[in-house]
UniProtKB/Swiss-Prot annotation:
Coiled coil: none
Similarity remark: Belongs to the beta-herpesvirinae UL38 protein family.
Role description: Plays a role in the inhibition of host apoptosis to facilitate efficient viral replication. Promotes stabilization and inactivation of host TP53 through interaction with host MDM2.
Any one GO biological process: symbiont-mediated perturbation of host apoptosis
Superkingdom of origin: Viruses
Species, as recorded: Human herpesvirus 6A (strain Uganda-1102)
Compartmental location: Host cytoplasm; Host nucleus
One Gene Ontology cellular component annotation held by this UniProt entry: host cell cytoplasm
Keyword field: Host cytoplasm, Host nucleus, Host-virus interaction, Modulation of host cell apoptosis by virus
SUBUNIT field: Interacts with host MDM2; this interaction leads to the stabilization of host TP53.
Keyword Zinc-finger found: no
Protein name: Apoptosis inhibitor U19
Keyword Metal-binding: no
Length: 389
């Protein structure tokens, strides 16, 4: 699902207003009502669509209404409902599954489903950019009051959130048929997949097999439009549940062009690379900040030109949002004249010397929810789609 510029601007406007008013319950609820009247739907970083609404727009039960008035230990006090995500089956009168999102009086975000409350994040802004889980580890149970103090529980949930914050989000599934071939307007032949060969890369400490085009495939020729981009599906590693699918793009640039998104779900993504001429230089993602993605519908993929400086680091010039979708960083490849062999953020794609004047990027974008539910976790395999604009 693609958003128009006006729709995206309206979503960003309401999300910014909700974030700024999250500390004032009455003002926050008023903004939620305005967003509900405008039919605002925001997408979480896990690709769940959150319909912004209050409890007047859903089928609420008695326990939920009690939570909104009284709260629950250790988050006692009035709560505000700001959204819901639902699963519908056919033309049924009620949703098959309904998860309600609540904001406590002290700013924490909680999820409610079938009488069980789950801790999700310590702030409203953090909620949109953190992996989501519904399990016994973050469930708030009725016997809590007899076990620990309020401060002990807050500390316990903060540690849980810190762990979830650094949990990479993998979009898994099978690529839809319309993305299973190279687009006809691209600069690579439609039978290009026959020329693919797998390479090994290290992704979050796990050896995965990725595929990349051969040098013969990428070699520009007179009858190819080297200024275009390629939409291409690549069959990546198999695991016990689903297949990881990746889209590669081929672009011409004098320096380096990186298309990436956050892979640790922290407040920013940081990438630095020495501009040395020798091979073997890898990225240390602890220096120059390339991407600050706050106050978006969710964190967006950034495409930007990067130039070397006297300090042998890359600076960003004229960043722009290229997509409204977000995912894990898979990597990028620099050009020969820059001299950086690869950019590693999640997975390195540059296992061989790159072609002069080109960089290779990969990123999935659109997907269905990939979320760990408390119920039937064996059925959480979801489909994902990917398109590189």
């Amino acid at each position: 699902m693609a958003f128009t510029g006006d729709e995206l601007a309206r979503m960003l406007q309401f999300k910014d207003k909700m974030i700024s008013s999250a500390g004032l319950a009455l003002k926050f609820e008023k903004v939620v009502q305005e967003a509900m009247a405008s039919g605002i739907v925001l997408q979480h970083i896990t690709c769940i669509k959150v319909r912004i609404c209050d409890n007047s727009d859903i089928l609420s039960d008695r326990q939920l209404r009690s939570l909104l008035i009284n709260g629950l230990y250790p988050f006692e006090g009035r709560m505000s409902m700001f959204g819901v995500t639902e699963e519908w089956e056919g033309a049924s009168a009620a949703p098959e599954r309904q998860v309600v999102f609540l904001l406590s009086s002290t700013g924490q975000v909680l999820g409610y489903e079938d009488g069980v409350v789950f801790y999700l994040s310590p702030t409203f802004s953090d909620f949109w950019t953190t992996a989501m889980e519904f399990s016994c580890q973050n469930a708030i149970l009725s016997n809590f009051i007899a076990q620990k103090s309020r401060d002990e529980y807050i500390d316990q949930f903060q540690k849980y959130f810190t762990r979830m914050r650094h949990t990479p989000i993998f979009l898994t599934g099978v690529l839809p048929r319309r993305f299973q071939k190279v687009e006809s307007s691209a600069c690579v032949e439609e039978d290009a997949r026959a020329s693919m060969r797998p390479i090994q890369c290290d992704s979050f400490g796990v050896k995965d097999t990725f595929c990349r085009p051969t040098e013969e495939l990428l070699q520009p020729s007179a009858n190819k439009d080297v200024g275009g981009k390629v939409c291409m599906s690549l069959s990546c590693r198999e695991d016990n549940s689903a297949r990881h699918c990746t889209i590669y793009g081929l672009t011409e640039t004098r320096g380096i062009k990186i298309m990436f998104s956050r892979h640790t779900q922290t407040d920013r993504s940081e990438v630095m690379c020495n501009a040395a001429t020798q091979t073997g230089d890898v990225v240390d993602n602890s220096s120059e900040t390339l991407f600050l993605g706050k106050n978006l519908v969710h964190q967006s993929i950034l495409e930007t030109e990067v130039k070397t400086t006297a300090k042998n680091t890359f600076d960003v010039s004229n960043p722009r949002i290229d997509s409204v979708y977000d995912t894990t960083v898979f990597g990028a490849m620099a050009t020969d004249d820059v001299g950086c062999e690869n950019v590693q953020g999640g997975a390195s794609l540059a296992q061989e010397k790159p072609l002069k004047g080109y960089c290779i990027t990969a990123t999935p974008s659109e997907c269905k929810p990939n979320i760990h539910w408390l119920k039937s976790p064996e059925k959480t395999v979801q489909e994902s789609a990917a398109v590189l604009r």
